[in-house]
Structures are given as C-alpha cells and as structure tokens.
C-alpha cells in the first residue's frame, strides 16, 4: 500500500462528544478543515436507543432504525452499553490517543482488550499504557507549558504518527492479525 492508498482508506472515528464552555467545537473543526467525508462517528437515538456508526452528519441526524431526527453523538450522560462499546472498538484497525497529556486513559486499555493496536503519545500516563499494551509510542515533537494549569504538555509529532500509520498498514494481513492477538494477550 502506498501512502496515498493508506490515506484514502484512513478515517477519524469520533465516538463521544464532550461539549465544554470554551472547549473544542467539533463541528466547526470538521467543516472548516473539509473533513466531513473522512470522519466517522457513533450516533445513538434518543427515541429508540439504536446506535450506529456513520459518516459525520452534524450534531444530530436521522436514526437509521426509527427514522426520527434524534440521533446524536454519545456523551457521559447518554452512552452505550459495554457490549455496544466493544462493537465500536472492533470497527477500528488502530486506536490513536493523540493528546497533549492524559491521565490513565481507559479508552486505550479498552481498545487493547478488544485486540486493537494502540498508538499513543510517549508522554504522561500514555507512555505506560502504550508500553504495556505492546503498542506504538508516538514521539513528542516538543514540550510546552500550558498557561491555564502551568503544567508541562507534549505536542505529538505529526510526522511520526504518519510513519506509524504507514508502517502498520503496509504490513500484510497476517502480521496485523498477529499484532491484534499480541495486543489482546498482553493486556
């Protein structure tokens, strides 16, 4: 697979939405960067509780099951069951935790328990999680001090993540299946 072929098959999957005052505006970021065709989301219906993955259709979309315009991205107040969450993780070929810092991140461990290889920034608690899940550590590009918290944070290397993705998906299916087994057994 060439880098272009890999990029054409690569999607960002957003499972949850955490709206916060002064925080990220997910819709604005997706639309302003012309990414709506490359972003997949989990939507769950307020009416019938049916969930499904879908290309990004805005904060609310029509439910595939009941037809009502009431499906939204799950959040801490209205999420999925453990069994449904396992099905979401099993949609992934690679879980990427691309954060400037992170406490102990359950999503990384959950993904690894489902046999999904993890790539995470080699900093903070992510460093230990990626090490113990036989994952891919993403190099830190540079450190900075966050003004609001006065804490040190890490900018991940975009180039190194691209190399990880290219390397992982350039391997044959047999290698990726074995990697999945190794990740699951090591978690």
Could you describe each region identified by the protein language model?
Residues 1-7:
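Short hydrophobic signal-anchor/transmembrane segments that target glycosyltransferases
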Residues 23-87:
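Nucleotide-activated donor-binding/catalytic signature segment of Leloir-type glycosyltransferases, i.e.
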Residues 84-85, 107, 114:
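Conserved sugar-transfer catalytic core signal across GT-A, GT-B, and GT-C glycosyltransferases
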Residues 90-92, 110-116, 121-122, 131-133:
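Conserved donor-binding/catalytic loop of nucleotide-activated donor transferases
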Residues 100:
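Aromatic "clamp/platform" in nucleotide-sugar-dependent glycosyltransferases that forms part
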Residues 105-108, 126:
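Short glycine/serine-rich donor-binding loops of glycosyltransferases
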Residues 167, 174-187:
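A short, well-ordered alpha-helix in the C-terminal region of glycosyltransferases
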């Amino acid at each position: 697979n060439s880098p272009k072929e890999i990029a054409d098959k690569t999607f960002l999957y957003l499972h949850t939405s955490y709206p916060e005052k002064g925080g990220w505006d997910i819709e604005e970021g997706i639309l302003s960067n012309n990414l709506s065709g490359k972003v997949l989301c989990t939507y769950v219906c307020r009416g019938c509780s049916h969930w499904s993955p879908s290309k990004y259709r805005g904060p609310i979309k029509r439910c595939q099951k009941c037809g009502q315009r009431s499906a939204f991205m799950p959040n801490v107040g209205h999420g999925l069951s453990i069994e449904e969450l396992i099905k979401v993780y099993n949609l992934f070929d690679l879980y990427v935790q691309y954060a400037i810092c992170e406490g102990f991140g359950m999503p990384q461990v959950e993904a690894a328990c489902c046999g999904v290889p993890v790539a995470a920034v080699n900093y903070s608690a992510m460093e230990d999680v990626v090490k113990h899940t036989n994952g891919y550590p993403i190099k830190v590009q540079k450190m900075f001090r966050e003004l609001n918290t006065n804490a040190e944070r890490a900018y991940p290397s975009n180039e190194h993540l691209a190399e990880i993705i290219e390397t992982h998906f350039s391997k044959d299916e047999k290698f990726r299946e074995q990697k999945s087994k190794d990740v699951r057994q090591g978690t």
